[in-house]
Amino acid sequence: MTTGFDLTVEEQLAILMSREVNDWETSACGALSFIPATAMLLGREMRAPNAEIIILGSRDYSPFVTGKDFHFHAQRGQLDLFFISAIEIDQHGNFNLHVIGDRDEPDVLMPGQYGTGMLYYAVPRIVMFRTEHTRRSFVDQVNYVSGAGTSPKGVSRRTREVKVITPMAKLNFNQESRIMELGSVHEGFSVDQVVENTGFNLGIRGEIDTTPQITEEEVHTLRTVVKSHMIDSETYPNEAANLIREP
């Protein structure tokens, strides 16, 4: 996927995730979310000029006084798309942002998810992402369920679409079978490579699509318009300066 453009992983993911931003919808990400913030700004430039963007903690794209206000906004049904960075993801659509290992005596203790588990129920479209595609990230069963991919019968849930985007592939959560499936493979990778680096069955049936190629226009817009805007608007300016290449 990076052939010809010398993309960083952050650039690649931002471009692929930007394609999920729709016009006339409200897309959002939490704090400490450089990649999805970049994706939303690029998506607005490329194909969704009327998209509303919420980037928690930013100067220009965070209309809320507290995170609690943002959560109320979501619970009222006013978000269409939310981006989640998960540490572990399993075949049932569960994600982990808390611990690796035993819950009481963890090998790794992570910051947690600050309401993301609730947003996983409240927002119609969810896009998760990882900067790596390995068996330690895509596991048969997460060590801790920070967000549940399925709900018990009788529990209200607005989420109708869940995708996962990685440097290798895009996965789709099948709402009927309740299993994460392989949706497409990025240029430069094979289905076998994705399978080898995934710790669960990807439900492959028939031929798998190739992800549409990253275009010169997407790369140029990211490295010029979006990078400049992020620096000028103080929206992750240091990350934009260091992780988005020069045109």
Model-derived segments and spans:
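Intrinsically disordered, low-complexity segments enriched in small residues
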Residues: 1-28, 160-180, 201-247
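N-terminal active-site beta-alpha-beta segment that forms phosphate/nucleotide-binding
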Residues: 1-67, 78
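A sequence-composition feature that detects small, non-aromatic residues
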Residues: 14, 28-31, 37-39, 48-51, ...
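Residue-level detector of alpha-helical recognition elements and their boundaries
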Residues: 32, 54, 108, 209-210, ...
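Short, charged low-complexity intrinsically disordered segments located at boundaries
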Residues: 47-49, 69-73, 223-231
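Short, surface-exposed, charge-dense and proline/glycine-enriched linear segments
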Residues: 57-64, 84-85, 116-118, 233-247
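Conserved phosphate- and dinucleotide-binding cores of soluble alpha/beta proteins
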Residues: 61-220
